A protein has these predicted regions:
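Residues forming anionic-ligand binding surfaces in small-molecule and nucleic-acid pockets
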Residues: 391-409, 497-499, 853
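Active-site-adjacent bridging/hinge elements
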Residues: 34-42, 64, 100-103, 128-135, ...
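Feature 926 captures the class I aminoacyl-tRNA synthetase adenylation module centered on the KMSKS loop
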Residues: 201, 417-477, 481, 526-569, ...
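N-terminal, positively charged nucleic-acid-binding surface of large information/translation enzymes
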Residues: 1-234, 275-288, 292-311, 343, ...
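Secondary-structure transition/capping motifs at alpha-helix termini
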Residues: 67-75, 96-109, 129, 133-138, ...
């Protein structure tokens, strides 16, 4: 029998246990026709990232599900992997090169990619090793990377298929441009931040009438690119200006006044400036009115100059411009300024010219890059796009039909809003690290060739001069294929794909429903004909103890690895789920981690106690029913109930409720009550009773460890292996389930009557400061004496009774008696010589107030028709029972007060 250390030290256990699991191959899963598959794909963290609390909660939840299903007999596969994270990784490599005095352009594309792969090799295993520290039971033999050979093949296959179907196209469109990262980003990657700003009220002179048109803008620096002013055609204030022009201040250029519904008569003056190259709404107005598109910003956030204009003019002169190709303005004195520098200079010139009427302060939402938080510039740019409408329709229908459900259900609305309002997806990025777009352009005739491999010649003119598009695909393009590309797709004969796909549960945060979840759903349906998973389990974010989002700027981030080093991975995992509810944010509270650590210590010490009381020749196994006493049947019934309830909780992704139940069972039921109750039997001269107590102790502990294992895998494995008769690992043991044969409701109720009475006596003695050594006789008045008569050994030890008399109605003298009351019994204990009568009355009145409060609470629930009609019948019945018990208890207390006079 394995001997346990006196104290539990996670640092001495966790790494050793994890290596034991790896060496045993327990995480590896194969297709098994005799088992039902259960598959989770890990949301791939950035390959060069570090474990944060978001990863910790996400992977803890996945591990709980996968360990539970493994124990339930499923072929449970958890596919791990990492994401190449184009923007983040490229930024890291560029930063490292900058320290060497190098730029991307200096080393060239091949040289840069060589450095990027070296960076990935150096730092790529960091996040994986950190996930292992957390206890993640992934099938590491199947670890994938979004740029590995298989995933890259899937990306090219999808791109070519969509292009051939006309669902991928290239064109000049309004995109979200990050001038810092120097790339386009998708709508989903724009984060909105409230910032202080201004409405600058400008005056544009009307050429035909000489009057001034007032309009307001938050971006005066864009005015150089204005190509029209819009009014609403129904606005009577400006009916006389239809067909007129304004003279653009500073440039002295005529631009038309157009009538368009974009101009809202109810807002401001009802006049808006139109800059088609730098505002998505203005771009649409420009298309409707065939306005020129004039770009005034460079892609790195400066004002355009002569060189920029010359390059654009050359493009037009050569006939290489495409639809919606913007003209470029030489901004003259403002050329080369940053956009903010230009704003100040332009406003100063407008003021000097009499064109700035007033400045109105305001707070407004400003789009920022989700990576670097720079302000996003709407820009016309030639990019690759995916047509979303044909792909979104079946993805919407799949969720509407219930093929995919969101937990909690309320997040279905987030998904639907995103899918129903999505624009075409900009998938090209001006980066070098990532999947290079599989498109080539003929240098001689300009033909575009899209193929999975490089073409030798142009199919149109036969030229061998072909240049591949330098851009890469949006990172989310490859991660959208993750549920099936990791299982062998596009090889549809893959055994893994046939067996493990579709996957079952996706666990993720609500912040990437648009980024990722929606794209996986439409991708799975479009390319495999099947929804990629049946359930999306949404969790919230981990906030600090004050409820604030963790961030570098606040300096309130918590490093999970530091928590693990101090408290152990099990304590961190348990804290993250205990009390949590699906979809809701949670707070990191150190005292909760300490409580989880204390729970682990409690379990360790309880197991040591049990093991120390086992003989060397002990053989585990539950005794026959005839040998079980009331307390045995009580604890086995409680265990049975917990197993059933936890199974139901986990089926509904209520991990917080399941964690709370096993915590309460182990701490309150097993450690605080059953072990204490078992001690007299262990130490008695009755060998049969002692053996029964030992067998029940070990049986219940074994089952409790299995129920706790998905939540706290390390300590449960260590303790399980110390139990006599244990198998090689707890991981592959059967999950405990509800067993009707171990459901002794009558004995449970009877024993809880005794427990309630003992608790009442002990509470009274504590409040009265009566020393445990001072024992007394007692009279118990009860209509059901049998449970108390069968528990006299417990009354003696835990209620400090020297002898007990039972009666249905006590009518004797109460002089010198202290009285305790429960719903099932009233105790009369001769202790007045040890206590103060006034104190006893005060205690009873305190108990009375407590009972009245309980009765009122339960009564209010039962008097609420909505509760009675809508709550589950079992819950209503439970409240009725509690109400009746509180009534009985109150009546007993009132009798006791009356008896004291």
């Amino acid at each position: 029998m394995k001997e346990l250390a006196k104290q539990y030290d996670p640092s001495q256990v966790e790494d050793r246990i994890y290596q034991f699991w790896l060496d045993g191959g327990y995480f590896h899963t194969k297709a098994d026709p005799d088992k039902k598959p259960y598959t989770i794909v890990m949301p791939p963290p950035n390959v060069t990232g570090q474990l944060h609390m978001g990863h910790a909660v996400d992977n803890t939840m996945q591990d709980i599900l996968i360990r539970t299903k493994r124990m339930q007999g499923y072929a449970a596969l958890w596919v791990p992997g990492t994401d190449h994270a184009s923007i983040a990784t490229e930024a890291k490599v560029v930063e490292a090169m900058r320290a060497e005095g190098l730029t991307k352009e200096m080393v060239g594309r091949d040289g840069f990619l060589e450095r990027a792969w070296a960076w990935k090799t150096k730092y790529g295993n960091r996040i994986v090793s950190q996930l292992k520290k957390l206890g993640s039971s992934c099938d590491w033999e199947r670890e994938r990377f979004t740029m590995d050979e298989g995933c890259s093949e899937a990306v090219k296959e999808v791109f070519v298929r969509l292009y051939d179907k006309g669902l991928i196209y290239r064109g000049n469109r309004m995109v979200n441009w990050c001038p810092h990262c120097n790339t386009s980003i998708s709508d989903a990657e724009v984060e909105y931040e409230e910032k202080d700003g201004s409405f600058w009220h400008l005056l544009y002179p009307v050429k035909e009438t000489g009057e001034m048109l007032e309009l307001a803008t938050t971006r005066p620096e864009t005015m150089l690119g204005d190509t029209a002013v819009a009014i609403n055609g129904e606005d009577p204030r400006y009916a006389h200006l239809h067909g007129c022009h304004v003279v653009l201040p500073l440039l002295n250029k005529e631009i038309p006044i157009v009538c368009d519904e974009h101009a809202d008569m109810t807002k401001g003056t009802g006049v808006v400036k139109i800059t088609p190259a730098h505002d998505p709404n203005d771009f649409e107005v420009g298309l409707r009115h065939d306005l020129p598109i004039v770009r005034v910003f460079t892609y790195d956030g400066h004002m355009t100059g002569a060189a920029d204009k010359a390059a654009a003019d050359a493009l037009f002169a050569a006939g290489k411009n495409t639809v919606n190709e913007p003209q470029v303005l030489d901004c003259g004195k403002y050329a080369g300024m940053t956009t903010l520098e230009a704003r100040k200079a332009i406003l100063a010139d407008l003021k000097e010219g009499g064109f700035l009427k007033e400045i109105e302060p305001l707070k407004h939402e400003v789009g920022t890059c989700y990576r670097c938080h720079s302000t996003i510039e709407p820009m016309i740019s030639k990019q690759w796009f995916v047509k979303m409408e044909p792909l979104a329709k079946p993805a919407i229908e799949s969720v509407e039909k219930g093929e995919i459900k969101f937990v909690p259900e309320r997040f279905t609305k987030n998904y639907m809003n995103w899918m129903k309002n999505t624009r075409d997806w900009c998938i090209s990025r001006q980066l070098w690290w990532g999947h290079q777009i599989p498109a080539w352009y003929c240098d001689d005739c300009g033909e575009t060739v899209v193929a999975k491999s490089a073409p030798c010649t142009c199919p149109k003119c036969g030229s061998a001069k072909l240049t591949q598009d330098p851009d890469t695909l949006d990172t989310w393009f490859s991660s959208a294929l993750w549920p099936f590309s990791t299982l062998g797709w596009p090889n549809e004969d893959s055994a893994d794909l046939k067996y493990f796909y579709p996957t079952n549960t996706l666990v993720t945060g609500y912040d990437i429903i648009g980024f990722w979840v929606s794209r996986m759903i439409f991708s799975g349906l479009a390319y495999t004909g099947k929804a990629p998973f049946d359930t999306v389990c949404i969790h919230g974010i981990v906030r600090d103890s004050q409820g604030r989002k963790m961030s570098k700027s606040l300096g309130n981030g918590i490093d999970p690895l530091e928590v693990i080093a101090q408290y152990g991975a099990d304590a961190l995992r348990f804290m993250l789920v205990d009390g949590s509810t699906p979809g809701n944010d949670m707070r990191y509270i150190e005292k909760k981690v300490e409580a989880a650590r204390n729970f682990a210590n409690k379990l360790w010490n309880a197991t040591r106690f049990v093991l120390m009381n086992l003989p060397e020749d002990f053989e585990p196994g539950l005794p026959c029913e005839e040998l079980l006493d009331m307390s045995d049947k009580w604890v086995l019934t409680k265990l049975n109930q917990v197993a059933g309830a936890m199974t139901d909780n986990l089926e509904h992704y209520e991990m917080g409720l399941a964690a709370a139940k096993i915590n309460s069972f182990i701490w309150d039921v097993y450690c605080d009550w059953f072990i204490e109750i078992a001690k007299p039997r262990l130490n008695s001269g009755d060998a049969q009773q002692a053996d029964t107590a030992r067998r029940v102790l070990v049986y219940v502990l074994d089952k409790a460890l299995k129920l706790l294992h998905p939540f706290m895998p390390f300590i449960t494995e260590e303790l399980y292996q110390a139990l006599p008769g244990s198998a090689e690992t707890i991981m592959t043991q059967a999950w405990p389930t509800f067993d009707a044969a171990h459901n002794w409701a009558a004995e449970e109720e009877a024993f809880e009557k005794v427990m309630d009475y003992i608790k009442a006596v002990r509470t009274m003695r504590t409040e009265m400061n009566v020393h445990p050594a001072k024992k007394t006789s007692m009279i118990i008045e009860t209509a059901d004496a049998a449970p108390f008569q069968n528990a006299q050994v417990y009354l003696a030890k835990f209620a400090f009774a020297t002898d007990v008399t039972f009666t249905e109605k006590y009518e004797g003298s109460t002089d010198g008696m202290v009285q305790v009351s429960t719903h099932a019994a009233r105790g009369f204990i001769p202790m007045m010589e040890l206590i103060d009568r006034e104190k006893e009355l005060a205690r009873l009145n305190k108990e009375k107030a407590k009972a009245e409060k309980e009765m009122a609470m339960f009564g209010n629930q039962l008097n609420n028709p909505k509760f009675v009609e809508r709550a589950p019948a079992a819950l209503v019945e439970e409240i009725r029972s509690k109400f009746a018990k509180s009534q009985d208890k109150l009546a007993n207390i009132e009798q006791s007060i009356k008896a004291l006079g």
